[in-house]
């Protein structure tokens, strides 16, 4: 099990987390006062877990306008060795980038941003202590490295969008 989508739909603990004043105050500072919860995900990168290639979150989530910020809370210490996130600062200003390059994850086909569209010289590692939090825009180009340790790397991603953003996908996609 690598990911659990929508834990807040099943346990009020995650709803309370999304409403926590320190988290919401930061989101409001970044997005303004009219925000709503889009969803959340638990990520569990196991020992030996593979990388996740460069992507943007918004193209995976069918919302318009693409105004989303993710609060990513580390449940374990997050290091370069256990698969931290890498971001290209300011890349959200470019807008949505075509995720046109195929990438195989075991038997599952995924898509990634072509390497030619990424400014790797600006890449920055986001390391966190357990309980630490990072924020990134839904159009920020980011990836995570492989887990080369014998410990899990777990995190809780809570996605917020502006109140004017709307779900544009089908009912089975959400």
For the regions a language model picked out, list residue spans one by one.
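Catalytic core of non-heme Fe(II) oxygenases with the double-stranded beta-helix
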Residues: 25, 51-125, 165-173
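Short acidic-glycine-tyrosine-enriched beta hairpin
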Residues: 122-135
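Non-heme Fe(II)-dependent double-stranded beta-helix
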Residues: 1-63, 99-100, 171
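A structural signal for short, well-ordered beta-strand segments
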Residues: 39-42, 71-73, 156-160
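Non-heme Fe(II)/2-oxoglutarate
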Residues: 101, 133-135, 139-174
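Residues that flank catalytic or metal-binding motifs in active/ligand-binding sites
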Residues: 10, 38-39, 67, 81-83, ...
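Non-catalytic surface loops within mature trypsin-like serine protease
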Residues: 46, 75-77, 160-162
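Active-site rim elements
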Residues: 11-16, 118-125, 143-146
């Amino acid at each position: 099990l690598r990911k659990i989508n929508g834990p807040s739909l099943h346990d009020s603990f995650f709803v309370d987390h999304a409403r926590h004043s320190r988290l919401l105050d930061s989101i409001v500072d970044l997005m303004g006062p009219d925000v709503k919860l889009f969803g959340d995900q638990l990520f569990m990168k196991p020992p030996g877990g593979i990388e996740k290639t460069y992507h943007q979150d918004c193209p995976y989530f069918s919302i318009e306008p693409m105004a989303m910020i993710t609060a990513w809370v580390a449940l374990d210490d997050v290091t370069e060795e256990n698969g931290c996130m890498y971001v290209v600062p300011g890349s959200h200003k470019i807008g949505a980038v075509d995720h046109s390059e195929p990438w195989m994850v075991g038997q599952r086909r995924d898509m990634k941003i072509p390497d030619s569209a990424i400014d790797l010289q600006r890449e920055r590692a986001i390391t966190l202590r357990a309980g630490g939090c990072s924020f990134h825009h839904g159009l920020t180009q980011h990836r995570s490295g492989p887990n080369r340790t014998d410990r899990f790397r777990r995190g809780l991603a809570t996605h917020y969008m502006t109140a004017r953003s709307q779900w544009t996908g089908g009912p089975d996609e959400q």
